[in-house]
């Protein structure tokens, strides 16, 4: 990928973001920053997004670097699923990935959340299905309020057969080995 070195920091808390970002940006010239980036991993997608926002607040132009996250590979997995679906809709049906009813099974985990946000921002109505209606509704609320989605609704797994009847797209984002 063209990188020379990587410096891992583990168990980083929100209170450490400012110091890490400023140590990164102020230890290089603005031209050297072109070869520097900050990657946020971990397992908590909401914390990763909060860390991105916190990191951005502590950059001082022209001392800025890209900040990106992929906790547990959830963001790249979701983006890949959506991209493949978008291509299939275009190639096989001459349709766009917008204005669709998207059902996301196992949707309360990080891949489901990322898929829901991407799908909603593409102009789709999204039904986020989980084992617990309360949890699914809470996650849908987070998608809509925190990430600017407008059309994510939580739903209960027990009703999934009814949701699948008029679904245009179905994503399975449950954990490996779980039959949905």
What are these regions (language model features)?
Residues 24-28, 55-59, 85, 89, ...:
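Hydrophobic, Leu/Ile/Phe/Ala-enriched alpha-helical segments that form helix-helix packing faces
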Residues 174-176:
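Short glycine-/small-residue-rich Rossmann-like dinucleotide-binding loops
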Residues 1-63:
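N-terminal ligand-binding/catalytic initiation module
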Residues 11-19, 43-50, 76, 80, ...:
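Conserved active-site and cofactor/substrate-binding residues in soluble primary-metabolism enzymes
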Residues 37-41, 66-70, 103-105, 125-130:
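Short glycine-rich or small-residue beta-strand-to-loop segments that form or flank ligand, phosphate
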Residues 46-47, 178-180:
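Short glycine-rich, flexible loops that bind phosphorylated cofactors or substrates
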Residues 69-87:
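A glycine-rich, Thr/Ser-enriched phosphate-binding loop motif common to dinucleotide/cofactor-binding enzymes
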Residues 87-169:
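Glycine-rich phosphate/diphosphate-binding loop of Rossmann-like nucleotide-binding domains
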């Amino acid at each position: 990928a063209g990188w020379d070195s990587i410096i891992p920091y583990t168990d980083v808390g929100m209170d450490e973001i400012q110091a890490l970002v400023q140590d990164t940006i102020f230890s290089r010239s603005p031209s050297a920053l072109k070869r520097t980036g900050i990657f946020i991993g971990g397992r908590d997608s909401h914390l990763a997004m909060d860390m991105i926002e916190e990191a951005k607040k502590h950059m001082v132009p022209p001392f800025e670097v890209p900040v990106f996250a992929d906790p547990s590979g959830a963001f790249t997995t979701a983006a890949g699923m959506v991209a493949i679906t978008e291509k299939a809709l275009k190639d096989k049906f001459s349709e766009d990935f917008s204005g669709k009813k998207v059902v996301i099974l196992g949707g309360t985990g990080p891949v489901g959340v990322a898929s829901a946000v991407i799908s909603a921002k593409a102009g789709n109505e999204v039904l986020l299905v989980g084992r617990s209606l309360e949890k699914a509704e809470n996650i849908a609320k987070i998608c809509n309020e925190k990430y600017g989605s407008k059309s994510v609704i939580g739903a209960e797994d027990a009703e999934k057969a009814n949701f699948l009847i008029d679904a245009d797209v179905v994503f399975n984002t449950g954990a490996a080995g779980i039959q949905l």
